[in-house]
Amino acid sequence: LLVQLERMCNPQMISKVHNSKNEKIKEFEKLVENYFKQYKMPSFYADKLHVTANYLNKICKTETDKTAGDIIRKRITIEAQRLLHYTNLSVNEIAHDLGFDNVSYFITFFKKQVQTTPEQFRKLANQ
């Protein structure tokens, strides 16, 4: 029992576990970058990483203080803001480009994330 406790408290072992979590987070962030337009659910990314959605959320929360869903939504929001600010694409085109089948759902999503509509954001960003 003492040997097991010593192994569990071994700083090298703790470091390996921490590094493993960091690697999973890095892999997750790469996957989000590649797939955020098509896949918005953490379960897709968890499957790709060969972990459960609950475990993915746990390591995200531990390492970044955000859930996996928060990280995905943040990436979608950043891309929406970039497209609104730097392109002349319509809100409908941006919604479609970001994988939203319904423009009104995109507007609701955007407003919840940014506290303003896409059109209002564009006007403010381009002043």
Predicted feature descriptions by range:
Residues 42, 53, 91:
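Helix-turn-helix DNA-binding elements, focusing on the entry/boundary residues of the two helices
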Residues 7, 11, 34, 38, ...:
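Conserved amphipathic alpha-helical interaction elements at protein-protein interfaces in regulatory
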Residues 1-3:
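Core structural elements
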Residues 56, 105-106, 110:
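Short hydrophobic/aromatic patch on the recognition helix
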Residues 5-30, 34-48, 62-70, 74:
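Short, Lys/Arg-enriched, Trp-marked, Pro/Gly-tolerant hinge/linker segments that flank
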Residues 43-44, 93, 120:
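Alpha-helical residues within helix-turn-helix
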Residues 48, 97-98, 113:
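Residues within the alpha-helical elements of helix-turn-helix
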Residues 62-107, 123-127:
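Terminal helix-turn-helix DNA-binding modules in bacterial transcription factors
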